Amino acid sequence: MSEPYLVFISHAGTDTWVAQQIEAHIRGTGAQTFLDEAHIGIGEDFEEAILTALERANELVVLLTPWALKRPYIWTEIGAAWMRRIPIVSVLHGLTAEELHTRAGVPVLLKRRDMITVNDLPRYFAQLQKRVQQHRSQ
């Protein structure tokens, strides 16, 4: 039997409640999730837990908000997913794709991908559910 399909959820601490809502819906598709405050215990090696989860992840969901763009860990997690060549699902909240595309310092690797808004998440969840089912049947 293969490992469970794992979705790593990257977000800024300010966006924790929104990230938790996304996590609940992702779990509803049958995927497992990694959300730092839910899966890293007090006193645990934070960076080691993140690295381990990113090594196992099948895809990355990154919640992009104006304040998330200022968080170094967001960019580190995106870079790790990019290096592993796993899907990077950019979820926009509080900014538009146009604002992100024109913002200085945003890497082309994000600009080249389709992005969705939080209002488009049901479409993503439906696609994710299909990927999870395909993964289980392998």
Across the structure, where does each feature detected by a protein language model lie?
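Short amphipathic alpha-helical segments
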Residues: 5-7, 111-114
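Short low-complexity, flexible loop/linker segments enriched in glycine and/or proline
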Residues: 48-52, 77-78, 103-107
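Conserved N-terminal substructure of TIR/SEFIR domains
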Residues: 1-63, 82-86, 92-97, 123-138
